[in-house]
Amino acid sequence: MSRNDASQLDDGETTAESPPDDQANDAPEVGDPPGDPVDADSGVSRRTFLEGIGVASLLGIGTSAASDDSLFQMGGLKPVDDPIGNYPYRDWEDLYREKWDWDSVSRSTHSVNCTGSCSWNVYVKNGQVWREEQSGDYPRFDESLPDPNPRGCQKGACYTDYVNADQRIKHPLKRVGERGEGKWKRISWDEALTEIAEHVVDEVEAGRYDAISGFTPIPAMSPVSFASGSRLVNLLGGVSHSFYDWYSDLPPGQPITWGTQTDNAESADWYNADYIIAWGSNINVTRIPDAKYFLESGYNGTKRVGVFTDYSQTAIHTDEWLSPDSGTDTALALGMAQTIVDEGLYDEAHLKEQTDMPLLVRQDTGKFLRASDVPSVNTDADRPEWMLLMLDSNGRIREAPGSLGERDGQKDYSKSIELDFDPQLDGETTVQTQSGRVQVRTVWAELRDELANWDPEMVHEETTVGKETYQRIAREFAEADKAKIIQGKGVNDWYHNDLGNRALQLLVTLTGNLGEQGTGLDHYVGQEKIWTFHGWKTLSFPTGKVRGVPTTLWTYYHAGILDNTDPDTAAKIRESIDKGWMPVYPEERDNGSRPDPTTMFVWRGNYFNQAKGNVAVEEQLWPKLDLVVDINFRMDSTAMYSDIVLPTASHYEKHDLSMTDMHTYVHPFTPAVEPLGESKTDWQIFRELAQKIQEVATERGVEPISDRKFDREIDLQSVYDDYVRDWETGEEGALAEDRAACEYILEHSEESNPADSDEQITFADTVEQPQRLLEAGDHWTSDIEDGEAYAPWKDFVQDKNPWPTVTGRQQYYIDHDWFLELGEELPTHKEGPENTGGDYPMEYNTPHGRWAIHSTWRDSEKLLRLQRGEPLLYLHPEDAEERGIEDGDSVEVFNDLAEVELQAKIYPSSQRGTARMYFAWERFQFDSDSNFNSLVPMYMKPTQLVQYPEDSGEHLHFFPNYWGPTGVNSDVRVDVRKAGGGDE
């Protein structure tokens, strides 16, 4: 049976209700009572047998005590040698058996942004994917930790349904109606690729190559598929979009304070902690494969505290639950920090060596005191303006080792932060500077003043959390041997998310809970980091010259939102762009003009559906794009609003790799079946598009074009040759196939092929069994050690290397002009913007849910059955009663931007005044032409647009998914009413 011709079982297959004809020998004889079959050997009918059992019961003959003969002496019962073999109507059992019968098994996984990276076995029968099953062969590396096997969730367990689903796109499609109208014409691959190629050649030849962009998220979930389009866009001189900041998954407080994108312990390390606070991380919903470590840690004596606004699915499994008001997590964290500091529960040695707390701050400017400020300091630093100063215990000014002034760039492990003197933590003095005598204080003194604002009365008033409760939690956290915070998206979705991140990080810093197993702040939101970094990077961006763009800013700018922004914020955005701190493409031309973007490729993502400011994206940005190409295995919202849709292979039809920072393994995708219909893998699609572009350019005689920004030429007549060439070895045609690209990543990555070792992980190794990575490369902060779970920050805490910040330490004081101007040089709590979306009484949140990974599985029939089958709005009972709303009513949630109709669900576990809709419902799943993001405006925070230092940016500089403005999903106001104005 061909999988292209049939997607379900034949109608004639047998069932328990309709036995096949070949069971005639088991049928009752003529004259027997209907429905009372007689066993062919014993001559005993089922009714007679049951009557006999009943008599035996009445006579008190227990089956456990009665002899074999006692039943048969009752008459009519005869022994049966093979009762199972002679039982009638048994062919139905073959259906069950056939479920566990297969022709082949392939190892694969799922390319979704969930951080799971779970290995699955995919079973094939008669050319059809029959089912999937979690593999159970992750190798154990520490017998004292819970078994890592198996990993998976209910979404992965029904991906088979997608393989032959009605949503599958089987052929190239061209739009013939309006965008979003759903009118398509089937075209050939040659027609599709030729039309796209001719458009691309036109754009590049006209110098508009930077008007071509590609959006695809999360390389770790399938790096070859990520690289497929990124590689071509890079060769064309086009623009690669960020994604981690766009989804508001990036915690900006981490690059601000620690100078890194993020680094986390693998989830197995949770078991090593004595104390865990799950803060805004609904582990039992969004981290299902890893939840076992959180749950089992309780059996290991770990105390688990939950901080959630609602009584969530994770809160019910914690020992204590704190419920601060929405958007007040920062105030709660600062209150806990104030308790720790005020009661002397901090780790003084850690603060002196590992943080900026002893550094001196000028009281006249708010800037760090630098060696260049003080004539009496004779420094050997190459950049004395970035050589920062401390006071030793005798009151003498000393240079802070590891400062940026003596380092060669952001990351320089040739220096050390180890101290040969005892610095003052709480110091204050007057210093003779180049401009006169200036009073200076330590950062610690400044921090204590800030924390004094967050006394118990203030914190309780702001958060409603009990004073004694949060103070006790703070003490317990500080006094635990190994304490850890697991932070989730619940902290990231707010406008002031950077302040929230910094405040939570402060708790682990104050208590010295960094740099060893069982400690740290683990931030798991999005599968953001890829282990095999170098191989992925050079595969994705072979020229080494990348036009990366922060997607939030790109969207904000081209959707016309900047023109409607408050003047102060708009001025900051323009200043950041003008100074080159944040790029926007297309670039400004010599005459001062800036073209509109013209071309967008989307693959492995659902940009249109997930876009904040969704109304502006549709009305302002989308009309500027002459060509939107979506590469997709299913018809989602972005595909609906595209011009050409190309069918790509499903997750069970291709070669690729999978990894995550939740564990230290790499494992593969392998094709269980051939791609459905005319679909091709992402790598094949972009490879063939490159080939078509080269053909068109050659026919036209298009000459190489000098890149305006980089020292390179864009040569369309060799773009296919360049695409399939191994740029590391120079071998021509080496990367023509997907599997070769997988091998390339593994071969060219330190994590899988260490330079100082004979060990190497090959693709074949991963097919045999998930492989634990051999080393941690340069973009990780600890080594992978045999026999222990990965835990970050050891490079700094144990090895004394400088942190990649201006100070060379964990940096809580940021003396950038914008931070000082906005009063955010230290972590503090601020209210969010007022009346975003309008002056309405309720907050609107869109958290991650249990039944989908972003929009994948949002249209799954099986999973829709678990959640009422349609979009839901969760309301507190009192909010619903106040509006005359009952469970199951159709309601409208609305603000100044849009109104969305959906079903109300009464949710007693939430706080009053909050309306929540789990995010990522597809636009076509709503009755109105809106979606969950239609209600959400787009706005950006100026502190996330800076470069620091302003002139060189070693600490904070735009790099895709490391530093850039985040999207904001919360801080939105709405109201709710019954649909139709309350009329029945």
Curated annotation (Swiss-Prot):
GO molecular function: 4 iron, 4 sulfur cluster binding; metal ion binding; molybdopterin cofactor binding; nitrate reductase (quinone) activity
Spans annotated as Disordered: 1-43
Biophysicochemical property: temperature dependence: Optimum temperature is 70 degrees Celsius.
Start-end of Acidic residues biased regions: 8-24
Gene Ontology biological-process annotations: nitrate assimilation
Regulation: Inhibited by cyanide, azide and antimycin A. Enzyme stability is not dependent on salt concentration.
Binding annotation for [4Fe-4S] cluster: 110, 114, 118, 153
Gene Ontology CC annotations of this record: plasma membrane
Annotated binding of Mo-bis(molybdopterin guanine dinucleotide), by residue: 249
Pfam families referenced in this protein's UniProt entry, alphabetically: Molybdopterin, Molydop_binding
Keyword Lipid metabolism in record: no
Keywords for this protein: 4Fe-4S, Cell membrane, Electron transport, Iron, Iron-sulfur, Membrane, Metal-binding, Molybdenum, Nitrate assimilation, Oxidoreductase, Plasmid, Signal, Transport
Cofactor entry: [4Fe-4S] cluster; Mo-bis(molybdopterin guanine dinucleotide)
Mode of membrane association: Peripheral membrane protein
Functional pH dependence: Optimum pH is 8.2. At 40 degrees Celsius (temperature of natural environment) the optimum pH is 7.9.
Compartment(s): Cell membrane
Subunit structure and binding partners: Probable multiprotein complex; a catalytic heterodimer of an alpha and beta chain is proposed to associate with additional subunits involved in membrane attachment and electron transfer.
Membership in a protein family: Belongs to the prokaryotic molybdopterin-containing oxidoreductase family.
NCBIfam families per record: DMSO_red_II_alp
Its biological purpose: The respiratory membrane-bound nitrate reductase enzyme complex plays a role in generation of metabolic energy by using nitrate as a terminal electron acceptor during anaerobic conditions. The alpha chain is the actual site of nitrate reduction.
Name the record gives this protein: Respiratory nitrate reductase subunit alpha
Gene behind the chain: narG
